[in-house]
């Protein structure tokens, strides 16, 4: 592939620069920004600026013709993404956005995990940003108030969840407090240390005020219904997939997929422990096996790092070509304790490597590797680290927008789930315990498809759900979703509770994993079949290289680009 910078690239790069101007937080997370001492403007005026920029950029794209296939993908992807952003803004979604995992209060809190702490200037920037938390959350409150005045308020369950997180951030377990009292601050000038402490206290107080606003002002206006309805759900589904799917067909496919995975797990349970041992019993026994246990976060971190490094070494040059900057991944324990596991991409110059984070719930001290080995492949190589790292690495082929700003869950999470199954197919999960963990991960994602569409579109409970103890017939709701989840997924209750709240508050995102994997496997199989028809040898490594070189785009755009 050889692509010369074009007029289309110039528009995309200009758009990226303007987004980073509007969002210093995005500038810091990508490594492209110059302002590292302020947070974003989350007020209605601040949010509207993005919509104006989207409209202006789409108008510019209409005036320029693509010069090659790379340009064609850029134009198609930008029209799809920016057009959808405008639709979401028209519907008031950015103003009302509030959930337990991906809304403003978490974005502000988690940004501080990414900020450099090497120099005095780095700490001065952190200090300034801590002092800016009050203003940033104040803008968010303005937006939530405006949405509420229009009758648009998140479900009460999400308001309560975020209020709980905000109280936590205001209290003694605050990540702000941990940050400014870390050993690294001891070498700083006393005046800066004092200011850091004062601004951390201010940031904590801002979260306390935010929690109070949520509980006293927003919660009384919030409804108890978790489902968002078919119309809103279809819009969210497009946001996370970059494709329009048949929700009813996908729901039935999810049920079938879940049944197939269950059959696989039953067979593994039999191989592990003999006839008559159920999947649930096998999972319980695996948890009790010392060979699959890590004790304490230090041991967990070491195991994560060793597993991730082994995957890089074993896959490079065989099934993937991994550029040198991507051969480094850093495994970290997150300062927060939400129960999530996530990846943050490298900075533009790779001075900050890609990182895998484990946010360990308070009180959790034993970690089961049979269940989490597949997660390391999902977040690391060949999952998110390879995919997002390649996007950053391909500076000569992809413009700034495609390298840094375009992220579609169905593409990205679909790839990471595809990577999990691929690692099993390549022999990395032949240990029966590890294989059970991979299948359990696949089962979770298939269950999400059924649960998410079921709850949010108000479907009747399927027979397999209605038959569970204490459930019965009726429409999907939180309690039946919990029964479905606990029946289908082997995770600690703290993790599962967070997961369910996430599905209820972030409609359309959870199915993107399995639906995205479905498309990735379909595209790969189509490419292999085409090669066979033409009498050519199919190279999986070449397919992966070509697919990852496109970067993260909507699934409809990806299929078109690879066909």
Feature roles, as predicted:
Residues 1-563:
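N-terminal maturation segment of proteins
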């Amino acid at each position: 592939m050889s692509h010369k910078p074009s007029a289309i690239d110039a528009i995309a790069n200009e758009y990226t620069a303007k987004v980073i101007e509007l969002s210093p937080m995005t500038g810091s997370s990508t490594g492209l920004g110059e302002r590292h001492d302020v947070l974003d403007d989350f007020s209605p005026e601040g949010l509207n600026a993005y919509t104006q920029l989207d409209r202006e950029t789409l108008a510019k794209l209409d005036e320029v013709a693509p010069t090659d296939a790379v340009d064609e993908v850029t134009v198609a992807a930008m029209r799809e993404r920016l057009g959808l952003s405008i639709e979401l803004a028209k519907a008031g979604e950015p103003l009302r956005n509030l959930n337990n995992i991906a809304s403003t209060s978490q974005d502000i809190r988690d940004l501080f995990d990414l900020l450099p702490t090497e120099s005095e200037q780095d700490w001065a920037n952190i200090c300034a940003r801590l002092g800016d938390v009050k203003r940033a959350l104040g803008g968010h409150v303005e937006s939530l108030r405006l949405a509420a005045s229009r009758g648009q308020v998140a479900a009460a369950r999400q308001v309560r969840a975020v209020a709980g997180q905000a109280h936590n951030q205001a209290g003694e377990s605050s990540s702000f407090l941990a940050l400014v009292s870390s050993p690294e601050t001891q070498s700083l000038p006393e005046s800066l240390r004092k200011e850091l402490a004062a601004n951390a206290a201010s940031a904590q107080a801002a979260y306390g005020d935010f929690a109070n606003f949520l509980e006293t002002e927003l919660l009384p206006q919030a409804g108890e219904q978790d489902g968002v309805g078919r119309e809103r759900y279809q819009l969210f589904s497009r946001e996370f997939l970059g494709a329009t799917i048949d929700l009813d067909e996908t729901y039935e496919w999810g049920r079938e997929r879940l049944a197939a995975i269950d059959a696989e797990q039953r067979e593994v349970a039999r191989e592990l422990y003999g006839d008559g041992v159920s999947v649930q019993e096998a999972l319980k026994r695996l948890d009790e096996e010392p060979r699959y246990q890590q004790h304490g976060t230090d041991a967990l971190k070491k195991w994560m790092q060793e597993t991730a490094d082994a995957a890089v070494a074993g896959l490079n040059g065989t099934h993937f070509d991994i550029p040198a900057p991507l051969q480094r991944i850093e495994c970290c324990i997150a300062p927060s304790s939400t129960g999530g596991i996530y990846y943050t991409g490298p900075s533009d110059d790779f001075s900050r490597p890609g990182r895998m984070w484990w946010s360990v719930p308070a009180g959790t001290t034993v970690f089961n590797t049979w269940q989490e080995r597949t997660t390391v492949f999902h977040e690391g190589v060949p999952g998110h680290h390879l995919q997002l790292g390649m996007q950053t690495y391909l500076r000569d082929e992809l413009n700034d927008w495609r390298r840094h700003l375009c992220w579609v869950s169905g593409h990205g999470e679909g790839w990471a789930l595809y990577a999990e199954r691929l690692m099993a197919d390549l022999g990395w999960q032949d240990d029966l315990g590890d294989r059970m963990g991979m299948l359990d991960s696949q089962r979770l994602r298939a269950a999400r498809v059924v649960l998410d569409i079921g709850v949010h579109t108000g479907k009747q409970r399927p027979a397999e759900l209605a038959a569970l103890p204490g459930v019965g017939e009726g429409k999907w709701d939180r309690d039946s979703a919990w029964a479905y989840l606990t029946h289908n997924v082997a995770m600690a209750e703290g993790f599962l509770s967070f997961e369910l709240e996430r599905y209820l508050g972030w409609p359309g995102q959870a199915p993107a994993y399995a639906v995205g994997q479905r498309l990735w496997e379909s595209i790969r199989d189509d490419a292999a079949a085409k090669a066979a028809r033409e009498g050519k040898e199919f190279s999986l490594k070449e397919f992966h290289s070509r697919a990852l070189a496109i970067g993260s785009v909507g699934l409809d755009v990806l299929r078109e680009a690879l066909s």
